[in-house]
Amino acid sequence: MTESVDRQTAVLRLRGADDILILCHKNPDGDTIGCAGALYLALKALGKNAAILCSDTIPKMYDYMELRWFDGSFNPAFVVAVDVASIQLFGENNNVPQYAAHTNLCIDHHASNSGYAYETLLDPGAAAACEFLLDVIVDMGVTITPQIANCLYTGIATDTGCFKFASTTPRTHMAAARVMEAGADVEKLNARLFESRSHARITAERMAMESLEYYFNDLCAVICLTWDQIESSGVAGAELEDLTSLPRSIEGVEVGLTYRQQRDGSFRISVRTSGSIDACNIARRLGGGGHTRAAGCEISGNLDNAKHAVLEEVRKELQRCGLLDQDTG
């Protein structure tokens, strides 16, 4: 059982530690990578020995960050996880599980955090883990350099859909302003993160939209990508992250579901909602989690079974919110 700690306690733990291993979640996104990069640079500034480990390869779109990857050259004495809500989200590669099982400190913003770490610094009100990691680093006595600022801005911007998602608050904008003042190259970062699409990404998007289906009086829209389609398009996994916003962006749709088949045949399902519909309610009942407007889960089996399982939970949530008659099957 984890012990919840405040920011000052987390700062004391980080300042008192050395030989620190920073863990990201699998299928890494901008927030987990941005946190890892910013924390690594902060620890380096304090003279600490630190490195980063992830179960999956970091997408090339984030290669502007200064990251030191763990190569086994030291024995970690302190393990910190960033933006990882549950032990299952670490993945199985690169010996990550053996380190994740002994996570000393988790820094996270998911309300669904399972409490796997010995101590957890949790801020579910933050739109991104990078949003409040900024204050952690400042309290560590580290100056926010342009390099650290770039990492933090990456996490804040990507987890808010470039400040479009409902999770964005005045505090989010203030954190973004602070990292801009510290030297984050916002113009270049936004262009790289949001305004560039590869040919492979466009091909994958076309395939996904060709699979579009509607359910529950068009309140729910579903798109799917099989592993064969992902492979044939040549698209990198990170390029598909913002694909999850497409079905929800359709006029009149309250729930958008994106199914992405993984190499092992299982499906990674992203849930995006609006209004009173809680995406986390849907995902949690399927063993996943996340936020009110953005959540996800993984389901084994064929696509039809995966669709049925998630759509059943969507139906219950729509009925709970009074958007669907109770007798609608």
Q: Locations of the language-model features?
A:
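Active-site cofactor/cluster-binding pocket
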Residues: D63-E119
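Hydrophobic helix-and-loop "lid/oligomerization" segment in the mid-to-C-terminal part
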Residues: T2-M61, F70-P76, T158-R285, G290-G329
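A generic local secondary-structure boundary/capping motif
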Residues: R68-F70, N93-V96, T120-D123, G141-T143, ...
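Short alpha-helices
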Residues: H110-A175
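Glycine-rich, phosphate-binding/catalytic loops in enzymes
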Residues: L39-Y40, V96-Y99, L122-D123, M174
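Short, motif-level signal for alpha-helix interfacial/capping segments enriched in acidic residues
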Residues: V5-T9, A85, I137-D139
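An acidic intrinsically disordered interaction segment
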Residues: M1-Q8, V96-L105, G125-L133
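Hydrophobic/aromatic beta-strand patches that form the interior of the parallel beta-sheet core
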Residues: L53, V80, T103-I107, E119-L122, ...
